């Protein structure tokens, strides 16, 4: 009589059809795929141009309006006002206007096209580690663990919040922009006029833009008034001067309605720079004096000149998203599958619960079941089963649903039904209609510690539900 040969199956080695297909692709086919750059798979809501060299927010429709107003006003000024002022005043007027115009355009483009300081999102492994740390730090109650951390900056407690989108704790002074869907370092605000967020890497360009635009607008506004005043002094009157130079009226209207907001914005950001604050912190009142002396700004140097140098003249931090870098090819095979690829019974992490349920099952089976010990044809040999013999002979494995096995013993697992008393057969049949994992106890003599778990739902076998 020849005993059946069994092959142990490692449930971690199971693969879904999709993962098996992707891992067995020929090398030539993978090598023929074009390498993609990181900006092509960037998760944020940004637009990239010139092969990732230029980045803008998706809602950048106001940026053309900003550029258009600057260009229209400047072109009208250099075309209709500068010739008259050069003849009656000095040739330095167009030179000064040209320098200011170039400075405004360059600073605007740098603000719009520069990475504001976007932080890359956490990788799956990093996110899993952070979630594990959060779960371990939680209490034994049903309340969820806190999603905040506290750190000390200049002897002052600063709270770090968890970003559910980027799956990480935000560094100090970092905030998540809802329009760009990115976490930005030293987040100031999202400016639709420049079509980008204003943060750590482009704040100096933004400040230079609004200050230079204030000077340019004030300069054009003063030159236009001077032009119309000189024309009206010739005896024709102010109305005639407007009729002689209608473009000056357009410039006057644009500058009049924009100069107040631009000057106010420049003054507000000058105060922020001198205090080493951000617009986001000022609006929220994070370091307001109303909260007491202990809630003062921990980032200030208590010196206006030092704060200005740190904010505007500090070293330019590098971009962390590497938008023009290549996405690494996924050539390395995955040796360990994720929980999504494993059966539901094996995806559980609570091993204590599984061990406890198996122990109770074995104790109940020791008092009510008899297992057939061989698979050779003929009269089956039965023997009473004790708890010790079950612990040494039971092999529990997990396998996908398959057809009923044959009675052959060559290299296949021989399965035999379990002789169950009639009083329990009704319970076993009722359990077949439930959506619970089932256990089948085959006959090979293996220890429980060396054999993996396998699920089977063959209709002709005896099953016991796992409660």
Curated annotation (Swiss-Prot):
GO terms for cellular component: endoplasmic reticulum; Golgi apparatus; Golgi membrane. One of its GO terms (molecular function) is palmitoyltransferase activity. Keywords: Acyltransferase, Golgi apparatus, Lipoprotein, Membrane, Palmitate, Phosphoprotein, Transferase, Transmembrane, Transmembrane helix. The gene is zdhhc18a. The keyword Kinase does not apply. It catalyses: L-cysteinyl-[protein] + hexadecanoyl-CoA = S-hexadecanoyl-L-cysteinyl-[protein] + CoA. Its EC number is 2.3.1.225. Residues 81-88, 226-247 are lumenal. The active site is at 191 (s-palmitoyl cysteine intermediate). GO terms for biological process: negative regulation of innate immune response; protein targeting to membrane. The DHHC domain is required for palmitoyltransferase activity. The chain crosses the membrane at residues 60-80, 89-109, 205-225, 248-268. It is a multi-pass membrane protein. The keyword Membrane applies. InterPro entries: Palmitoyltrfase_DHHC (IPR001594), PFA4/ZDH16/20/ERF2-like (IPR039859). Palmitoyltransferase that catalyzes the addition of palmitate onto various protein substrates, such as CGAS, HRAS and LCK. This is Palmitoyltransferase ZDHHC18-A. It is found in: Golgi apparatus membrane. Residues 1-59, 110-204, 269-467 are cytoplasmic. The lineage of its organism: Eukaryota, Metazoa, Chordata, Craniata, Vertebrata.
């Amino acid at each position: 009589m020849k005993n059946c040969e069994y092959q142990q199956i490692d449930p971690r080695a199971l693969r879904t059809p999709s993962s098996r297909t992707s891992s067995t692709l020929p090398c030539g086919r993978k090598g023929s795929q074009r390498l993609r750059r990181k900006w092509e798979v960037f998760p944020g809501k940004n637009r990239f141009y010139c092969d990732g060299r230029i980045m803008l927010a998706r809602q950048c429709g106001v940026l053309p309006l900003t550029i258009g107003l600057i260009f229209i006003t400047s072109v009208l000024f250099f075309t209709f006002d500068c010739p008259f002022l050069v003849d009656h005043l000095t040739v330095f007027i167009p030179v000064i206007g040209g320098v200011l115009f170039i400075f405004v355009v360059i600073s605007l483009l740098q603000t719009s096209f520069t990475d504001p300081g976007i932080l890359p999102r956490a990788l799956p492994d990093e996110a899993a580690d952070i979630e594990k740390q959060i779960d371990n730090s939680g209490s034994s109650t049903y309340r969820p663990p806190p999603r905040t951390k506290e750190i000390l900056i200049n002897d002052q407690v600063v709270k770090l919040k968890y970003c559910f989108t980027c799956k990480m704790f935000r560094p100090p002074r970092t905030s998540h922009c809802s329009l760009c869907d990115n976490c930005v370092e030293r987040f100031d605000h999202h400016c639709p006029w420049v079509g980008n967020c204003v943060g750590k890497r482009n704040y100096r360009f933004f400040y230079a833009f609004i200050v230079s635009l204030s000077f340019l607008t004030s300069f054009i506004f003063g030159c236009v008034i001077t032009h119309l005043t000189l024309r009206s002094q010739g005896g024709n009157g102010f109305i005639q001067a407007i009729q002689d130079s209608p473009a000056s009226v357009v410039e006057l209207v644009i500058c009049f309605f924009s100069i107040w907001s631009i000057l106010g914005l420049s003054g507000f950001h000058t105060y922020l720079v001198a205090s080493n604050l951000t617009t986001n912190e000022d609006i929220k009142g994070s370091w307001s004096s109303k909260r007491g002396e202990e809630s003062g700004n921990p980032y200030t140097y208590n010196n206006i000149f030092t704060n200005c140098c740190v904010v505007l003249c500090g070293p330019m931090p590098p971009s962390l998203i590497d938008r023009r870098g290549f996405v690494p090819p996924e050539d390395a095979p995955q040796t360990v599958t994720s929980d999504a690829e494993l059966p539901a019974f094996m995806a559980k992490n609570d091993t204590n619960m599984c061990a406890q349920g198996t122990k109770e099952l074995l104790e109940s089976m020791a008092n009510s079941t008899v297992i057939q010990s061989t698979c050779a044809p003929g009269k089956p040999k039965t023997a009473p089963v004790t708890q010790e013999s079950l612990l040494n002979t039971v092999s529990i494995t997990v396998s996908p649903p398959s057809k009923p096995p044959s009675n052959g013993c060559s290299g296949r697992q021989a399965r035999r039904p379990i002789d169950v008393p009639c009083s329990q057969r009704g319970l076993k049949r009722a359990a077949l209609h439930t959506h619970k994992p089932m256990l089948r106890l085959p006959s090979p003599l293996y220890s429980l510690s060396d054999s993996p778990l396998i699920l089977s739902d063959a209709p002709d076998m005896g099953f016991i539900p796992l409660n």
